[in-house]
Amino acid sequence: MQIYSKSEKAFKEAKKVLPGGVNSPVRAFNSVDASPVFMDHGKGAYITDIDGNEYIDYVLSWGPLILGHANPSVVQAITNAAMKGTSFGTPTEIETELAKLVIERVPSIEIVRMVSSGTEATMSAIRLARGYTKREKILKFEGSYHGHGDSLLIKAGSGVATLGLPDSPGVTKGLAADTITVPYNDIEGAKLAFEKYGEEIAAVIVEPVAGNMGVVPPIEGFLEGLRELTTNYGSLLIFDEVMTGFRVDYYSAQGYYVVTPDLTCLGKVIGGGLPVGAYGGKKEIMEQIAPAGSIYQAGTLSGNPLAMNAGFETVRQLTPQDYDVFRTLIKRMEEGLTEISARRQVPLSINKAGSMFGFFFTDQKVTNFDTAKTSDLEFFRSYYREMLGQGIFLPPSQFEGVFISTMHTEKEIDKTLDAFDTTCKILRG
């Protein structure tokens, strides 16, 4: 039985000075009816809270830590950089070195601009798309998260292709009116949207694997269809690979699915655990960004040496063979979960992509946000708390992706399967 007394005390103190006691909403554990666990340190595939409880970590800071916690080479790279100075506000050579590595590995990127978050990357890419095409509307997909930029916090209305409605107080109707939303994996819905608004659409922004409704891969023809649509209408195709970049494949999701967008947004892995974002693409488009062009974007800490060194050392270490191992381990997890859920009579649907996977407590195949929402959320809450008590740290939301690192092995997978079996036995008998 885990003891959380120090975490509970820390949360009470945090709520006095932070909104809801956290700096990002999902960390509050509200969706699992629990108080958040405060972490102290991590090593490899494991993370330890301030009460001394150790967990196998499948959150990995929401994806960035593909090499696991406290990778010695990454820690050394950060330390060496910090000893020289944490930030200069000038160009440094390491920015160029990381940019070269990104360009080498991401098929669509010819030029890349470093920023400080995934949200900043998607906001900047959309501004660039609007400036480049001289159009204003953006098409996105229901249930996909592209950061907290105002124009992207939009909820779909009724019908196949609708103009958006604000999904958060503070988002104006004017911004929402320029956002078109259709269901993920619905190429026919996208076609209808283009038939109605095609000459006004600056860009389609899409996660090539949706990671914020759980993990939902594209169905056959979806990404290819978007590529064809945007090309035919003179719109840009933006892949939001903040989560999937270097997670799905050595060459990111676009390399795995062999679909090349006009612009790509990155984050998470390319910062090695430090704040980072990037957007890049075709030279002719990227050269419209200041100072080469007139579309403005800037940032005080963009390309800061700590994040650049951490990111370079992380990406440098990854090999094509790592992704073979990821797929083998996740297949082992999938087969084990499937066998146990059938034996324990727990409905379960599993999706996977590279080093990411998602599971839903439903009999339905999950291909979009509507089918993701058929998952038994009440069961998930109980399941989550029980798994946490057995030392398995998962995202505290049904609608988040699950990650592994190069430090996860069959040992961790098998321990997790044992915990899953015990949990299902407790909850379902």
Swiss-Prot record:
Q: SUPFAM superfamilies per the record?
A: PLP-dependent transferases (SSF53383)
Q: Which GO terms describe its biological process?
A: protoporphyrinogen IX biosynthetic process
Subcellular location(s): the record lists: Cytoplasm
Q: Which Gene3D superfamilies match?
A: Aspartate Aminotransferase, domain 1, Type I PLP-dependent aspartate aminotransferase-like (Major domain)
Q: Which residues carry this modification: N6-(pyridoxal phosphate)lysine?
A: K268
List its EC numbers.
5.4.3.8
Q: Which reaction does it catalyse?
A: (S)-4-amino-5-oxopentanoate = 5-aminolevulinate
Instruction: Please classify the protein's predominant subcellular localization into one broad category.
Output: cytoplasm
Q: Could you say which enzyme class this protein belongs to?
A: isomerase
List the cofactors: pyridoxal 5'-phosphate
Spell out the PROSITE patterns in the cross-references: AA_TRANSFER_CLASS_3
Q: Kindly state which keywords UniProt assigns to this record, in alphabetical order.
A: Cytoplasm, Isomerase, Porphyrin biosynthesis, Pyridoxal phosphate
What the entry lists under InterPro entries is as follows:
4pyrrol_synth_GluAld_NH2Trfase, Aminotrans_3, Aminotrans_3_PPA_site, PyrdxlP-dep_Trfase, PyrdxlP-dep_Trfase_major, PyrdxlP-dep_Trfase_small
Q: Which GO terms describe its molecular function?
A: glutamate-1-semialdehyde 2,1-aminomutase activity; pyridoxal phosphate binding; transaminase activity
Q: Does the keyword Isomerase apply?
A: yes
Homology family: Belongs to the class-III pyridoxal-phosphate-dependent aminotransferase family. HemL subfamily.
Record-linked NCBIfam families:
hemL, PRK00062.1
Please identify the protein, giving its name as recorded: Glutamate-1-semialdehyde 2,1-aminomutase 2
Protein's organism: Listeria monocytogenes serotype 4a (strain HCC23)
Taxonomic path: Bacteria, Bacillati, Bacillota, Bacilli, Bacillales
Q: Which gene encodes it?
A: hemL2
